[in-house]
Amino acid sequence: MKQILITGGAGFIGSHLCARLLEEGNEVICLDNYFTGSKENVIPLLKNPHFELIRHDVSIPFQAEVDEIYNLACPASPVYYQIDPIQTIKTSVLGAVNMLGLAKRVNAKILQASTSEVGSKKSLCRWLERC
């Protein structure tokens, strides 16, 4: 059984990833500060003994013994970027630094998520997403 940390785990993608990894028999730690995520998204998971929900801001270092890290923490809309641009930058930059540091310390695999917002708005191409 793997110990897995998911930052931004109470967001849309994060909550679905938490559910999937629990279904596969893993121990899941979900971190979220609820800036854009919601505890409502993970309420069904709270009864699973292999699920732990922690309110935490990834711009502050976090310690855990884990095998894998999925760093999904970041406000997911330009609307939120404008509401609190400093928090957005802190979450993206310090969050990545903190999770990479944790991964190095505990020798964990890490997936660093990004956003379609890094692409050009002028692109005429359609985004194709495959699972």
Summary of predicted features, one role per range:
Residues 1-131:
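N-terminal Rossmann-like NAD(P)+-binding domain of SDR-like oxidoreductases, especially those catalyzing
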